């Protein structure tokens, strides 16, 4: 199936990548076939999130997507964390977004 192409390629190269502790796959922000392949091949996900007004909308979308992929295609997929980007501690909005993200995952 098309969703497993990256997982199959990484499995075929397991001798080459066995010496690495982590393999990072940088994906586009949309849920296309490339991102779906990465989620199927991955053990975990780190989500970069800009500290902006609609940030939590993106968080809820990605958590639903990860849950759906875990149920249907990759049972070992886990959300390992959110990495806040464009964070400006002088900006009240950045602090509010950080606080909201922490509350979302409690």
Model regions: which residues?
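Short glycine-rich substrate-engagement loop in P-loop NTPases that contacts/grips substrate
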Residues: 1-6
């Amino acid at each position: 199936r098309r969703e497993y192409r990256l997982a199959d390629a990484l499995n075929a190269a397991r001798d080459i990548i066995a010496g690495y502790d982590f393999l990072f796959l940088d994906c586009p922000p949309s849920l296309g076939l490339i991102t779906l392949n990465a989620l199927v091949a991955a053990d975990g996900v780190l989500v970069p999130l800009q500290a902006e007004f609609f940030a939590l909308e993106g968080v809820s979308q990605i958590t639903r997507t990860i849950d759906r992929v875990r149920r249907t295609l990759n049972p070992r997929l886990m959300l390992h964390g959110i990495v806040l980007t464009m964070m400006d501690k002088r900006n009240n909005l950045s602090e509010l977004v950080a606080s909201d993200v922490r509350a979302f995952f409690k």
